């Protein structure tokens, strides 16, 4: 047992599907304390975060759309450990959210995807100057990390690979951050994939997907009924090797989210990817 005060946690995007899962997970963790729930949807303003997340009892934490005052409130509490904000919002707002949090000394744990490489580098520089930890994690599933590690191992033996990512039809960005990260991990191996065998012609633009790092193509599917799924398909003469990860419940991300909340306090810079803290 420890007498250390629990870590103050703000959830941004609290009314979303991932936000509600994070609220439940944080509320059930004895070393964490939900102190704020932010959401810009007017429909949910002033509702209790616990009730909105489906908990049996209210948490007495109202939903608010005021991010800056909440950051200031948590930053000013000198009796508690440094605060953490978990961000599952939107690609259009996440960059500003992260900069604001770092400016207040609040450690961001970011699951929102859609940041450009230039934005990530700028945030990394900002976090370095502030000596403040920040985690940007495209996918919090430990199973997805294992898939990516298996893909790295397989890439030593296959020259041809493509990625298919499938998500629910309310996902705003494509390709997914996880698919881009998977391609980046393979691209960092210093190997060029998919050597051209014929001159291809796309009868419809984009029919062959987008080209990511080192010639790896990514294909995106958006349909109702899906949550989050990814295939990495390797091909060679006479064989196909397929790696696939399926998410059937968003609860699968919560062990990774809780791990990130606890780990980010010890960081002094921006770290990208769950695999870096496992």
UniProtKB/Swiss-Prot annotation:
Protein name: 4-hydroxy-tetrahydrodipicolinate reductase
Positions annotated to bind (S)-2,3,4,5-tetrahydrodipicolinate: 168, 177-178
Record-linked CDD domains: DHDPR_N
Catalytic activity: (S)-2,3,4,5-tetrahydrodipicolinate + NAD(+) + H2O = (2S,4S)-4-hydroxy-2,3,4,5-tetrahydrodipicolinate + NADH + H(+); (S)-2,3,4,5-tetrahydrodipicolinate + NADP(+) + H2O = (2S,4S)-4-hydroxy-2,3,4,5-tetrahydrodipicolinate + NADPH + H(+)
Gene Ontology biological-process annotations: diaminopimelate biosynthetic process; lysine biosynthetic process via diaminopimelate
List of residues binding NAD(+): 13-18, 111-113
Gene3D superfamilies hit by this protein: Dihydrodipicolinate Reductase, domain 2, NAD(P)-binding Rossmann-like Domain
Pathway: Amino-acid biosynthesis; L-lysine biosynthesis via DAP pathway; (S)-tetrahydrodipicolinate from L-aspartate: step 4/4
Classification via InterPro entries: DapB_C, DapB_N, DapB_N_CS, DHDPR_bac, NAD(P)-bd_dom_sf
Subcellular location(s) per record: Cytoplasm
Single GO cellular component term: cytosol
Role: Catalyzes the conversion of 4-hydroxy-tetrahydrodipicolinate (HTPA) to tetrahydrodipicolinate.
Alphabetical keyword list: Amino-acid biosynthesis, Cytoplasm, Diaminopimelate biosynthesis, Lysine biosynthesis, NAD, NADP, Oxidoreductase
Keyword NAD belongs to the record: yes
Source organism superkingdom: Bacteria
NCBIfam families for the chain: dapB
Pfam families tied to this protein: DapB_C, DapB_N
Family: Belongs to the DapB family.
EC identifiers of the protein: 1.17.1.8
One example GO MF annotation: NADP binding
Subcellular location, principal: cytoplasm
PROSITE patterns attached to this UniProt entry: DAPB (PS01298)
């Amino acid at each position: 047992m420890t007498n250390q005060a629990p870590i103050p946690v703000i959830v941004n995007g609290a009314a979303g599907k991932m936000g509600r899962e994070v609220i439940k997970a944080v509320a059930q963790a004895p070393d964490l304390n939900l102190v704020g729930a932010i959401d810009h949807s007017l429909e949910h303003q002033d509702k209790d975060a616990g009730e909105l997340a489906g908990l049996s009892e209210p948490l007495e934490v109202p939903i608010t759309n005021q991010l800056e005052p909440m950051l200031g409130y948590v930053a000013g509490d000198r009796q508690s450990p440094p605060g953490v904000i978990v961000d599952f919002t939107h690609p259009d707002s996440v960059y500003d959210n992260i900069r604001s949090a770092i400016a207040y000394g609040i450690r961001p744990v970011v699951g929102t995807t859609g940041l450009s490489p230039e934005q990530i580098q700028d945030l990394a520089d900002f976090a370095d100057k502030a000596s403040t930890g920040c985690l940007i994690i495209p996918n919090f599933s430990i199973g997805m990390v294992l898939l990516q590690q298996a893909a790295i191992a397989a890439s030593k033996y296959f020259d041809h690979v493509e990625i298919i990512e499938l998500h629910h039809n309310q996902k705003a960005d494509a390709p997914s951050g996880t698919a881009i990260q998977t391609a980046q991990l393979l691209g960092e191996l210093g190997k060029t994939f998919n050597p051209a065998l014929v001159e291809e012609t796309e009868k419809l633009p984009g029919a062959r997907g987008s080209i990511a790092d080192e010639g790896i193509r990514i294909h995106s599917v958006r349909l109702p009924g899906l949550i989050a799924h990814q295939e990495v398909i390797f091909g060679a003469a006479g064989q196909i090797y397929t790696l696939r990860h399926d998410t059937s419940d968003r609860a699968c991300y919560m062990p990774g989210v809780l791990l990130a909340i606890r780990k980010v306090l010890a960081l002094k810079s921006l770290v990208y990817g769950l695999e870096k803290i496992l």
